[in-house]
A protein has these predicted regions:
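Active-site and donor-binding regions of nucleotide-sugar-utilizing enzymes
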Residues: 1-100
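A donor-sugar binding/catalytic signature common to diverse glycosyltransferases
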Residues: 33-34, 41, 56, 82, ...
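A nucleotide-sugar donor-handling region in carbohydrate enzymes
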Residues: 78-154, 303
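Donor-nucleotide binding loops and adjacent catalytic segments primarily
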Residues: 120-216
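Catalytic binding pocket for nucleotide-activated donors in carbohydrate/polymer assembly enzymes
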Residues: 229-274, 279
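C-terminal amphipathic helix plus adjacent low-complexity
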Residues: 272-309
Length: 309
């Protein structure tokens, strides 16, 4: 089925109801929320109305091309405890009126998870995926940009045009997420699969397989947050296309570009010359333990003051 804007409202309403029912049954002391998708906005609303304090992970970031940007900042204002993954994001949360005493940068859970993930060998990936990985690998994901309506078709066509111009690469696409215009992107990908060899498409690879491919990939390309947040762990060369991640901190292994063919080609010619050795700015020690300990021991106060700068 085609995804429509009305579906977002329906899922948001459903999320509020489900969270409300869980709160009635479980009676939690705190609601922990990670990220900025519309589904969890419903959980934040239900928790706020039920007077349950909220601990929010990944606040303070910017994604100026997506609805997620406004959702993220809204959840920040609902929340009483904050875990940004970078000091720049911490500063932005303070700008939103949150008390610095409630904001803690312990690093990113994603970066920590990758550091602890058992990466699969190339031979194992070949068996699982039934693909002979005997050429350079390009890992690609392209999502709809929710604040750029009716543009997804042209945007994915430009990416496909660029990838079609390359030879001697294995291109592995993962599915776009469940947003408006997802079907437009999938339709173009299906056409591409039929035209060019060594193109593969997976609805979902799972975390371990995806991370393992990312480590050995020659290039990651698209507009997924994983390209910005996760590739620095391996220093994998990455092209971030368009505005979906615009505003996020960009590591030296990543280059931004516009949607058109020439911009993507220019970015490719630049990024292939860069070194892979870069530190992950979101990686710190004992991130999960520090977050969990703070959530358990923090003194929550539902009566929040606005912190003026």
């Amino acid at each position: 089925k085609n995804f429509k804007d009305s579906n977002v409202s329906n899922y948001l309403i459903k999320s509020i109801k489900i969270t409300r029912d869980v709160i009635k049954k479980v009676k939690p002391d705190v609601c922990v929320i990670l990220g900025d998708r519309y589904e969890i906005l419903g959980s934040a609303i239900a928790s706020m109305i039920s007077r349950i304090p909220i601990a929010h992970i990944h606040g303070g970031e910017l994604t100026l091309g997506a609805l997620d940007d406004s959702i993220r900042h809204s959840i920040t204002k609902f929340s009483h405890l904050h875990f940004p993954i970078h000091d720049q994001y911490k500063k932005r949360i303070i700008q939103l009126g949150e008390n610095p005493k409630s904001i803690f940068n312990f690093g990113g859970l994603g970066a920590h998870s990758i550091s602890k993930t058992k990466v699969l060998k190339k031979e194992d990936l070949e068996k699982i995926l039934k693909i002979k990985l005997n050429q350079k690998i390009i890992l690609a994901t392209f999502h709809p940009v929710t604040l750029e309506k009716y543009q997804s078709g042209n945007q994915i066509k430009n990416l496909i045009k660029f990838l079609n111009s390359l030879n001697n690469y294995i291109i592995i696409f993962t599915s776009p997420n469940f947003d408006n215009e997802t079907q437009v992107i999938k339709k173009e990908l299906i056409k591409f699969l039929k035209k060019k060899k060594n193109i593969y498409y997976f609805d979902s690879l799972g975390s371990q397989i995806y991370i393992s491919l990312m480590k050995i990939a020659y290039l990651v390309i698209g507009n997924s947050s994983s390209g910005v947040l996760e590739t620095p762990s391996f220093g994998t060369k990455t092209i971030n296309i368009g505005n979906r991640q615009h505003g996020r901190i960009i590591s030296p292994n990543i280059i931004n570009c516009d949607y058109d063919f020439n911009s993507i080609k220019k970015a490719f010619n630049k990024i292939i010359k860069r070194s892979k050795k870069v530190p992950n700015p979101f990686l710190k020690k004992n991130t999960p333990n520090k977050i969990a300990k703070k959530i358990l021991n923090f003194k929550y106060d539902l009566k929040k003051n606005f912190y003026d700068i």
